[in-house]
Amino acid sequence: MKNTNHYVVNFDDKLHTSPYSISLYRYWRQLHRQQRLFIIAIVLLCLFIYIGYRSHGAEKMKKLPEDYHRQEVAKDKQAWQRKKIEQIESNKVKVQKRIFSNPINEHQIAVRDAMRHAWKAYRTYAWGYDELQPISKTPSMWFGIGLTIVDCIDTLYIMNMTEEYNDAREWIATSFDCDANSVDKFNSHFEITIRILGGLLSIYHLTGDEIFLKRAVELGDRLLINFNTPTGLPLAEINLKRKAASGYRWTSDSALSEVGTVQLEMRDLSRISGDQKYENAADKSAAVLHNQSKKDGLVPIFISPLNGRFSGGVVSFGARGDSYYEYLLKQWVQTGKQRSVFWDDWIECIGGVRKHLWRLAYPEKLYFVGELMSLSTFSPKMDHLACFLAGNMALGWSYQRNLTYLLDMAKDLTKTCYKMYAKQPTGLSSEIAYFNTDAQLNVETITVRDNDAHNLLRPELIESLYYMYFLTNDKIYQDWGWNIFQSFEKYTRQTDGYSSINDVRNKDNVRPRDKMESFFLAETLKYLYLLFDTQNLFPYDEWVFNTEAHPLPAYKN
């Protein structure tokens, strides 16, 4: 049964009254009337002041936002961020806009007309897509961020194609968006770096337009993800949309050229943004490559970004190897010729070329650069890609002119590469050539196999002709460049744009491919235009071209 009794407190009950309250009451009763009035007045005054203070404070509190304290924390954070931004801003390299004139001779006019023809076709049938398919007149998608636009905008600017440049600039400002437009798949980190980041960096240096720097930073932050490996060497592929990095599906290795041909771009991004993180990644990856053991400066074409070890034994200045060696010299130039390790590694690899890869082909006695299989067996195969080495050696000679063998080798290799063009009925080189090294055999000096007979509108020989002409002042290199340009016009020009071709050996049926490479506009036509100028628009002590022909400044340190 529940207890229904309740405890009741009677405050009138003297048993429950505090002795203190009783004594206080007696004290109050003993005071004179005036004393009591004075105390009451004091109490009322204090009460009035208290109420006024509370109402004033409440009014002030009404004006404060609900997240007042969060804002105070945010202010502290913003102050720290402002300090960091101010530090970054102070580190930024100042860029001065360059102005280019119109073409100055018939050769340059012809090249600019070719550029306008290629651009018009892309603008008509593939605007905003990565590349044009000129036979079907349809666009093709690769990265999803306007590859042709970004890759060749500096070419448009250098050729003073104002209307076309303005269209390209507007697209980059309003439509270049890795979140919204990039394709949801893994693509080459290397290609995106040299073509798209390189293009943005270059056009920023030429114009000083901050929109290009903004886009470069947006892209660079994504590309930085790939360097997050145990060694610091970048993974081979990146999904721009997902901000995810990956190695190849078919191997855990990356190509030598891919891990060794991103340093110019990342370092330059730090110099113009003021944020050191990109250059730190470039330097760490460069250090890993420098510290590996080499065979007279030569290394295999595959390396693991997970442990930094080379695999296989193929040594090549063609596909998967070429631009690693190219960037050794160019990083030395970019850093004000202050970091001797780059020069030392480069000059050592040239010694390795002379010892292991440099051969004479018969009966025409043409020097070429072959390949090593398993680090020992020589192969008389040379990719057209390897023709870059002629200009690279000439460039190295321009800084150390006592090393005359560099210029001699550059001249010999340039001649051989031009023969790869001149000996074909179309006047265009195949992608790969084989050379006869046996003086006793009665065969052609250069042979082309069926699978290697295509031409992709590549720039490597034109690039070397550009260096050779301005370093020797020998007009033969301009003449060779003009001959090649005329062959491009005759055999690769389509009603809309230009196309790669499948067979340089058959001038009656070159079998066009439905593809116009972005590097034809970004590199081949740019180098042709520069070759035909009367002065070098990019002095070699002040500028260095990345492997996609995007000019970047050579810094003093």
Give residue ranges: language-model regions.
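Glycan-recognition and catalytic cores of secretory/periplasmic carbohydrate-active enzymes
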Residues: K2-N557
